[in-house]
Amino acid sequence: MLRITVKTLQQRASFHHSFKHISVPDLHTRAQNDQTNCYCQEINARLPSKTDPLDPHIKLPHRTPNYNKHVLLLSPGDRFAQPWKVAWNHNLDTNTNRPYNAISKLRSHLGGSPGILINAAHLQNEFIPRPKQHDEWLYFFVIPDMKLYVIKETDIEEFASFLDEGAIQAPKLSFQDYLSGKAKASQQVHEVHHRKLTRFQGETFLRDWNLVCGHYKRDAKCGEMGPDIIAAFQDEKLFPENNLALISHIGGHIFAGNVIFYKLFGREKMQNKLDSLWFGKVYPHNLKLLCENLENGKIIDEMYRGGISMN
């Protein structure tokens, strides 16, 4: 039984859903700590010698990047492929092979525009079409558009202009700034000048998302834990109707166990409003507790990194 402590949510904008913060009671925490210590020892035994060990006692910071669009480049291959382990370079922008070279090209054409996150993602279920190996098309899923855009490599510049339309008034903390440790965004805005804007149709897929960091070459802790967390989602049948994917680096690799939930609000009205909730120090043994409470509108404070509303 959880002891519930209601707190005021500190966030840049009110969530579309109504959430309460809760804290895990002391007795339950001791049991969780025993499981966590055992799991961390298991993970550390798998890590390369040069990787810093997983330390469950590192304090979880309560901050997330300020953004208004999340662009996911979908990795080719079925869910048993392991691009997150072998194909995603430490820095995705250094990838020269298709399709990942599209990330640096897209970022270049965006010109450092703030408010747009770009990641690679590898789908773990079949609700969205995925590219095949050696596919000539690029598959980008954009949140909160909730649309899959399938484009040619020659369309990247126009696609960047299309994406940037919604970022004109974004704060100046880019995702790259966030990953490099800059905690606060300037409240200034900048003007984006577009050339002729190409409209991209896209195909709508209105489902919630669970994104689990599994970027092995960025930090082996995430690369080892990510598949374990994915397996826990599947074995426990947690949010089985959601899109589930491994995602490249989203910060927080020091403490690892990073999961983003995108929860749609008003999907029946095609409003595309959603809440973005970021968690860290998520382990296979505490994932069920996190998900069950989230489904009931409760956020476990000990794992919460922060969140924003998007529309």
Swiss-Prot record:
Q: Which InterPro entries match?
A: Aim32/Apd1-like, Thioredoxin-like_sf
Spell out the SUPFAM superfamilies in the cross-references.
Answer: Thioredoxin-like
Task: Name the Pfam families on file.
Answer: Suc_Fer-like
Cross-referenced PANTHER family, in alphabetical order? ACTIN PATCHES DISTAL PROTEIN 1, ALTERED INHERITANCE OF MITOCHONDRIA PROTEIN 32
The UniProt family comment states: Belongs to the AIM32 family.
Protein's name in the database? Altered inheritance of mitochondria protein 32
Q: What species is this protein from?
A: Saccharomyces cerevisiae (strain RM11-1a) (Baker's yeast)
